[in-house]
Amino acid sequence: MKEYAILLDDTYCVGCNSCAYRCIQEFRYHDQAAKGLFRTFVNINDDGMYQKRCMHCEAPDCVENCPVKALTKSESGQVLYDAQKCIGCQTCVRMCKFHVPQFDADAKKIVKCSMCAHRVGEGKKPACVEVCPTGALQFGEYEEMLKKAKTISAKNNLKIYGMKENGGTHVFVLAKNEPTSFGYVKVQAKDIKKKVSMSDTVTVPTAIAAVAIGGFKKFSERRTRIEAQEKDKESKE
């Protein structure tokens, strides 16, 4: 199975947010975007353009800690999210070192990039890469993108972000200035001892936590339903 990666050359990004608009259209999350929740978005800063998106870590903390396995890592390298399994516990929000997952309080779900796994599976590029007008975003096989990032970095004296942070990611950012100076989170570099995959099983403590949280969710839903019924009854009286 081929692994893929995205290469973002910040020196070509003009902050037009075509990537964000195209992403909204692709996944039809206009309501969430209206609340300021995005799968990807570019913030313009003096030192560079900070593009907030999932970094698709080699060993994602969100996947390792999700109690119900709503987050998994595909063999292609993407960190995927299953909203049907999600119980809204926000563990991923707390555990992500890159501060990526955003919680939709109304839907009780999270919002994050999937690297357009559905498009990649069809042989297409992610929507954001396809629409980028300046070529700031590139997509390809992991080793190819990594090699290209190193080559461009050496040639133009650019910083590389995402190659070693948190043990490595599937998103490489090239920038003239230190990426952490214009929005990217400072994350410690570390070696990967074990890759997390979709076949990884849930540990016993995690399974127990899943049952507990699941019970709490049912209790909360029942309480909300009862309160709604009581309010409806009072309004009729």
Language model features: what each stretch is:
Residues 1-237:
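Non-ligating segments of multi-cofactor redox enzymes
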